[in-house]
Structure formats: structure tokens, C-alpha cells
Amino acid sequence: MLLHIIARGKIGRSSEAEMVERYLKRIGWPTKVTELPDRGGTIPIAPPASVTIALDERGEAVSSMLFAKKLEGWRDGGKREAQFLIGAADGHDEAQRAEADWLLSFGPATWPHMLARAMLAEQLFRATSILANHPYHREG
């Protein structure tokens, strides 16, 4: 299953960009990053057999284990792509939230969207590591 991060804003050559790159290189699944301008630009149309996840502070906060179970369920259920949407500084509008299959939160705090991208990359690596029985994740 393709893990596709669709993010508003250019990450450039920042420490966050280095973190994103480091984690995405370690993931054994195919990955893709699409950057859109802060305003405007078109979110790529979700292909058939895909799931859309919007990162949103009002979404569901889950453990790394539950996040891995979600990925596993989508993969084993025939989803070919998981699109992770990261909004700009003002987040997503109501229509984007309504269209998403799942709203995911990294807790009640508000995170800078560039840091949220790095956090998502790490959680994707952690989740795929859990599913591969890799020792990276330590529960408890």
C-alpha cells in the first residue's frame, strides 16, 4: 500500500525536512510526498481503493499500536493507497474534514504543520515496523 503524504507548504532544507527524509527512507512500504502551496493548488484525486486521512487537532488521538492496526486493516482490506493530508497553518476547512475517511490527531496541542509532517513520517515508520515485528517500537 502506498503511503502518500500530501502537505501544504514547502518544507525546503530544514531540520524537519531531514527528519521526514530519514524516516521515509527507512519505511519498507512505498511512499510519496506531494507538496502544495499554502493556499490554492489541487489535492490529488484519491484513486479507487484508497483511504484519506486528514491530520486535524479535532481528530482521534490513537496509540502507535492502534495506528499500526489501522494501517494493517486498510492494507489487508485491499486499500492500495493511504493519503495523509496535512493542512497549512489554518488547518483544513470543513469540507475537507467531511470528505476524509478518518481524522487523525497528534493530541490536543496545536503543532506547526512542518513538525506535523516529521511526526507523521516517524509514526508511519513506527507503525510499519510494528507490523514487520521490527524491534524499533517498545511498548510499555
Briefly describe each language-model feature range.
Residues 28-83, 91:
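S-adenosyl-L-methionine/SAH cofactor-binding core of RNA-modifying enzymes
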Residues 16-18, 64-68, 97, 117:
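Conserved strand-to-helix beginnings and helix N-cap segments that scaffold or border functional pockets
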Residues 87:
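Rossmann-fold NAD(P)-binding glycine/threonine-rich loop
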Residues 96-140:
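Structured adenosyl-cofactor binding patch, chiefly the S-adenosyl-L-methionine
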Residues 1-27:
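N-terminal beta1-alpha1 ligand-phosphate binding loop
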